[in-house]
From Swiss-Prot:
Protein's recorded name: Ubiquinone/menaquinone biosynthesis C-methyltransferase UbiE
Entries under NCBIfam families matching the protein: MenG_MenH_UbiE, PRK00216.1-1, PRK00216.1-5
Gene Ontology MF term list: 2-methoxy-6-polyprenyl-1,4-benzoquinol methyltransferase activity; demethylmenaquinone methyltransferase activity
Keywords tagged on the record: Menaquinone biosynthesis, Methyltransferase, S-adenosyl-L-methionine, Transferase, Ubiquinone biosynthesis
Function field: Methyltransferase required for the conversion of demethylmenaquinol (DMKH2) to menaquinol (MKH2) and the conversion of 2-polyprenyl-6-methoxy-1,4-benzoquinol (DDMQH2) to 2-polyprenyl-3-methyl-6-methoxy-1,4-benzoquinol (DMQH2).
Biological classification of the source: Bacteria, Pseudomonadati, Pseudomonadota, Gammaproteobacteria, Pseudomonadales
Signal peptide: none
Biological process terms in GO annotation: aerobic respiration; menaquinone biosynthetic process; methylation
Species whose genome carries this gene: Pseudomonas savastanoi pv. phaseolicola (strain 1448A / Race 6) (Pseudomonas syringae pv. phaseolicola (strain 1448A / Race 6))
Uppermost EC category: transferase
Record's catalysed reaction(s): a 2-demethylmenaquinol + S-adenosyl-L-methionine = a menaquinol + S-adenosyl-L-homocysteine + H(+); a 2-methoxy-6-(all-trans-polyprenyl)benzene-1,4-diol + S-adenosyl-L-methionine = a 5-methoxy-2-methyl-3-(all-trans-polyprenyl)benzene-1,4-diol + S-adenosyl-L-homocysteine + H(+)
Length: 256
């Protein structure tokens, strides 16, 4: 977190993309972005990743170890890609909670899953990752896919996730990260800051939201930093896997 003070009584600031804003304003600004993109979020994911996001999520599911009867929390679950898969894995004796802080994203996810016939073992909860409204030691697995970078106090969110996991439970963080070679890094910069806003303008008439998303990726902790943050929060056996030359990384940690 970028915590800056102009005086002893000044409110701490944090980054919103490349801008510094008062901490109290970040959640509202992020909410505005996702209210704007919610209706076409799935379409834009497919266009901007060339469908690769489905492969990244599939790998996260394979590494989750989720099985019949488990209880899973899908934070920042958005339109429900992971929740739908987990619903099949846990079966009628398990439960999946799709949690999202953004009401528009939550509605899109609920409507989409209901249209697909996914309902019996899925619950939808509007929740803040920093203050999860669930009991201690409650879930076998917690996931957050492409959501942690939008959280103001990431350390608080990681500790909240640790609290709600059962001992031995797994946290999986799927997030954009730092490319592992210079050529990919340069290509990714050009793609992110030129193509992403352009596609946002053409498809959703909103280039600024996609410019923020590109900037938020650059401001997110890199692979090793996030690993250290998870260890500091209390997770054990923290590892990460780079995908697509580090464009995306999947971190996994275990609650002791």
């Amino acid at each position: 977190m970028n915590d800056q003070r102009k005086g002893s009584d000044a409110e701490p600031t944090t980054h919103f993309g490349y801008k510094n804003v008062p901490e109290s304003q970040k959640a509202e600004k992020v909410a505005e972005v996702f209210h704007s993109v919610a209706a076409k979020y799935d379409l834009m994911n497919d266009l901007l990743s060339g469908g690769m996001h489905r492969l990244w999520k599939r790998f996260a599911i394979e590494l989750s170890g989720v099985r019949t009867g488990n209880r899973v929390l899908d934070i920042a679950g958005g339109t429900g890609d992971l929740t739908r898969k987990f619903s099949n894995l846990v079966g009628p004796t398990g439960q999946v909670v799709l949690a999202d802080i953004n009401a528009s994203m939550l509605k899109v996810g609920r409507d989409r899953l209901l249209d697909l016939g996914v309902s019996g073992n899925v619950e939808f909860v509007q929740a803040d990752a920093e203050k999860l409204p669930f009991p201690d030691n409650h879930f076998d697995c917690v996931t957050i896919a492409f959501g942690l970078r939008n959280v103001t106090h990431k350390e608080d969110a990681l500790r909240s996730m640790l609290r709600v996991l059962k001992p031995g439970g797994r946290l999986l963080v799927l997030e954009f990260s730092k490319p592992t070679n210079k050529l990919m890094s340069k290509a990714y910069d050009a793609y992110s800051f030129a193509f992403m806003p352009l596609m946002g303008k053409l498809v959703t008439n909103d280039s600024e939201s996609y410019r923020y998303l590109a900037e938020s990726i650059r401001m997110h902790p890199n692979q090793e930093t996030l690993k250290s943050m998870m260890v500091e929060a209390g997770f054990d056996r923290v590892t990460y896997h780079n995908m697509t030359a580090g464009v995306v990384a999947l971190h996994r940690g275990i609650k002791p």
